[in-house]
Swiss-Prot record:
Gene inactivation effect: SMAD1 deletion results in early embryonic lethality due to failure of the allantois to fuse to the chorion. Chondrocyte-specific conditional knockout show a delay in calvarial bone mineralization and reduction of postnatal bone formation.
MH1 domain span: 12-136
Organism in which the protein naturally occurs: Mus musculus (Mouse)
Gene that produces this protein: Smad1
Modified residues (Phosphothreonine): T322
Signal peptide limits: none
Chain's role: Transcriptional modulator that plays a role in various cellular processes, including embryonic development, cell differentiation, and tissue homeostasis. Upon BMP ligand binding to their receptors at the cell surface, is phosphorylated by activated type I BMP receptors (BMPRIs) and associates with SMAD4 to form a heteromeric complex which translocates into the nucleus acting as transcription factor. In turn, the hetero-trimeric complex recognizes cis-regulatory elements containing Smad Binding Elements (SBEs) to modulate the outcome of the signaling network.
UniProt xrefs under InterPro entries: Dwarfin, MAD_homology1_Dwarfin-type, MAD_homology_MH1, SMAD-like_dom_sf, SMAD_dom_Dwarfin-type, SMAD_FHA_dom_sf, SMAD_MH1_sf
In-chain residues carrying the UniProt-annotated modification N-acetylmethionine: M1
PTM statement from Swiss-Prot or TrEMBL: Phosphorylation of the C-terminal SVS motif by BMP type 1 receptor kinase activates SMAD1 by promoting dissociation from the receptor and trimerization with SMAD4. Phosphorylation by ERK2 MAP kinase in response to EGF or HGF prevents SMAD1 nuclear accumulation and transcriptional activity in response to BMP. Dephosphorylation, probably by PPM1A, induces its export from the nucleus to the cytoplasm. Dephosphorylation is inhibited by association with EGR1. Ubiquitinated by SMAD-specific E3 ubiquitin ligase SMURF1, leading to its degradation. Monoubiquitinated, leading to prevent DNA-binding. Deubiquitination by USP15 alleviates inhibition and promotes activation of TGF-beta target genes. Dephosphorylation, probably by PPM1A, induces its export from the nucleus to the cytoplasm. Phospho-SMAD1 is ubiquitinated by CHIP leading to disruption of the SMAD1-SMAD4 complex.
Entry comment, domain topic: The MH2 domain mediates phosphorylation-dependent trimerization through L3 loop binding of phosphoserines in the adjacent subunit.
Family listed: Belongs to the dwarfin/SMAD family.
Protein name: Mothers against decapentaplegic homolog 1
Composition bias type Pro residues, residue spans: 221-232
Annotated region described as Disordered, given as residue ranges: 162-246
């Protein structure tokens, strides 16, 4: 049955446009979304014809089809608010679209959503879906002068407990700056301290580091750079096209290709696991994320939805009144999504969430243990596979311990409602009533394979390893 026959009371224009609707999108909601669009486009000469041309001839060039941009950039359709280009890309191209982070405008688009013009283009064929970048393999030297001092990945869940600093605090978007160009050094001559032409844009390392060749070392009292608020909080992912050929550093002259082992990144079955804590007590079983879009909320879900981790279902006999009250305020919680090799956290709760992500802190030039406050309605990129890949590729030439340090980057901590750090009376995440720990399986497994190739005290690197 043609989808247009389902709507006997809609206008001919709406019926025509619904003919190109993708089948999985909700029928009634799609009808209302298209009807709202038709009313706007009828006020513009030729706009309807241009949209129909784009939908009927997807491979042919088409012009922008624009509607006025609202104050908050969103469009309301039947009690649901969303970004207009996401709504219509979902209706006509990708029913499984979750977020604007999954879309990039084509170069031909004159009014892309991120440009903050008075008009925004909703032509679904002026956007493309973000693809996961292919990460180059890490080249691990077969011979090493380093003497590994650690065993392989132990219980990484406790890695951050001995940090000597009380975490600093930052608030999104106020404390964040929009990177002017590439978010980190991007040329062979501008990399890290202790390398030729090292840049000052570094990842400050814990002062307890004893490795003089560490690419992350920086005095503990070095102040962070001045921060400027970003131009557009909605587009605050700072993403730039990255030349993946630049990510693996050139091999030293004395090492030939035959002296290295290539270790490739592999996408795991579950991209992350999430563990819930109340104070310093783990509560319930770990949640393993198979979907790239996961909700962690304070409700109960008897249907056992694989895309939701419902904290309301979990019981704890040691729960006190502070924890009970905090749990009541988690509400819609946080939306985590993994797209294009990047992890985003969107705060759906009416209360803020607080995130400690070393990868995010590295990207923004913060101290590694900084805790970032994400207010309600905001989203922040909390992990980038490409940046992690570059750090890993550079770390293998600094020895086992430097690579092992990166395990800390693969665990993200997130507190609901209550913050912790220098600006709060709670100094550690284990003092917050309700928090989660996110373990990123892909980067962790990649590290594990690299460390295995590098050897351990029980398996020293040799010419026959």
């Amino acid at each position: 049955m043609n989808v247009t026959s389902l709507f006997s009371f809609t206008s001919p224009a709406v019926k025509r446009l619904l003919g190109w609707k993708q089948g999985d999108e909700e029928e009634k909601w799609a009808e209302k979304a298209v009807d709202a669009l038709v009313k706007k486009l009828k006020k513009k000469k030729g706009a309807m014809e241009e949209l129909e041309k784009a939908l009927s001839c997807p491979g042919q060039p088409s012009n922008c089809v624009t509607i006025p941009r609202s104050l908050d950039g969103r469009l309301q359709v039947s009690h649901r608010k969303g970004l207009p280009h996401v709504i219509y890309c979902r209706v006509w191209r990708w029913p499984d679209l979750q977020s604007h982070h999954e879309l990039k405008p084509l170069e031909c688009c004159e009014f892309p959503f991120g440009s903050k013009q008075k008009e925004v283009c909703i032509n679904p064929y002026h956007y493309k879906r973000v693809e996961s970048p292919v990460l180059p393999p890490v080249l691990v030297p077969r011979h090493s002068e380093y003497n590994p001092q650690h065993s392989l990945l132990a219980q990484f869940r406790n890695l951050g407990q001995n940090e000597p600093h009380m975490p600093l605090n930052a608030t999104f978007p106020d404390s964040f700056q929009q990177p002017n160009s590439h978010p980190f050094p991007h040329s062979p001559n501008s990399s890290y301290p202790n390398s030729p032409g090292g840049s000052s844009s570094t990842y400050p390392h814990s002062p307890t580091s004893s490795d003089p060749g560490s690419p992350f070392q920086m005095p503990a009292d070095t102040p962070p750079p001045a921060y400027l608020p970003p131009e557009d909080p909605m587009a605050q992912d700072g993403s730039q096209p990255m030349d993946t050929n630049m990510m693996a550093p050139p091999l030293p002259a004395e090492i030939s290709r035959g002296d290295v082992q290539a270790v490739a990144y592999e996408e795991p079955k579950h991209w992350c696991s999430i563990v819930y804590y109340e104070l310093n007590n783990r509560v319930g079983e770990a949640f393993h994320a198979s979907s790239t879009s996961v909700l962690v909320d304070g409700f109960t879900d008897p249907s056992n939805n694989k895309n939701r981790f419902c904290l309301g279902l979990l019981s704890n006999v040691n729960r006190n009144s502070t924890i009970e009250n905090t749990r009541r305020h988690i509400g819609k919680g946080v939306h985590l999504y993994y797209v294009g090799g990047e992890v985003y956290a969107e705060c759906l709760s009416d209360s803020s969430i607080f995130v400690q992500s070393r990868n995010c802190n590295y990207h923004h030039g913060f101290h590694p243990t900084t805790v970032c406050k994400i207010p309600s309605g905001c989203s922040l990129k909390i992990f980038n596979n490409q940046e992690f890949a570059q750090l890993l590729a550079q770390s293998v030439n600094h020895g086992f311990e430097t690579v092992y340090e990166l395990t800390k980057m693969c665990t993200i901590r997130m507190s609901f409602v209550k913050g912790w750090g220098a600006e709060y009376h709670r100094q550690d995440v284990t003092s917050t009533p309700c928090w989660i720990e996110i373990h990123l399986h892909g980067p962790l497994q990649w590290l594990d394979k690299v460390l295995t190739q590098m050897g351990s005290p029980h398996n020293p690197i040799s010419s026959v390893s």
